């Protein structure tokens, strides 16, 4: 809801992300001496080799980790990002999907492939291989690695990844790395707000025009 509220002009990221940014910096002392030397694959490999006790990452990383150490016993828990137990939520999101174009000349064949891929038994194979959580309702067996998240999954207490709303032009990944190196909360938040208004201006204009037109609905 944060991105929507910012687009509506009701708040800004300087206000909404300040506490988060400060807590983000607090994680640095618990990492390696030079955390910026690690790429994604490097971090997965280091964790697989026992160079760290915990790894703040999503369940999607487990196939990469297990490719290095198949016998590693991995467990998980939901990051306690709030001081209030009731406010805790599981970050999750759909980043894989299928589609058939409107101009497809072989739609029946394409739909047959999709029906095959989305059959329960094939979804279960994908779950087993990728340690994934299905988007399709059904009696699927999740990996024991997800036991620490199961309560949230079964309750539907999940919140979409914020980066699904970030314009790619903002290069938020680079902004975050710069922030962690410089550790200047004010500069990071100021740039984030400025870039959001710049690269998201068309959506902001449409959202505010819509809300103005439908304010009494």
Task: Give a label for each model feature.
Residues 35-48:
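Short helix-initiation/N-cap motifs at beta->coil->alpha
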Residues 154-217:
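Conserved C-terminal helix/tail region of periplasmic/extracytoplasmic solute-binding proteins
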């Amino acid at each position: 809801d944060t991105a929507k509220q910012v687009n509506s002009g009701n708040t800004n990221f300087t206000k909404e992300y300040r506490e988060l940014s400060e807590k983000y910096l607090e994680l640095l002392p618990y990492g390696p001496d030079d955390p910026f030397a690690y790429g994604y694959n490097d971090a997965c490999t280091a964790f697989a080799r026992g160079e760290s006790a915990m790894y703040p990452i999503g369940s999607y990383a487990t196939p990469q980790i297990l490719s290095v150490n198949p016998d590693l016993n991995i467990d998980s828990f939901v990051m306690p990002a709030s001081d209030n137990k009731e406010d805790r939520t599981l970050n999750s999101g759909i980043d894989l999907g299928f589609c058939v174009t409107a101009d497809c000349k072989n739609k029946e064949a394409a739909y047959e492939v999709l029906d095959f891929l989305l059959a329960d038994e094939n979804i279960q194979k994908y779950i087993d291989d990728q340690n994934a959580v299905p988007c399709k309702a059904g009696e699927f067996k999740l990996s024991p690695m997800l036991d620490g998240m199961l309560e949230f999954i079964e309750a539907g207490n999940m919140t979409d990844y914020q980066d699904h709303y970030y314009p790619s032009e903002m290069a938020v990944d680079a902004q975050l790395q710069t922030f962690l190196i410089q550790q200047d909360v004010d500069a990071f938040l100021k740039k984030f707000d400025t870039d959001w208004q710049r690269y998201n201006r068309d959506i902001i204009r449409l959202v505010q025009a819509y809300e103005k037109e439908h304010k009494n609905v």
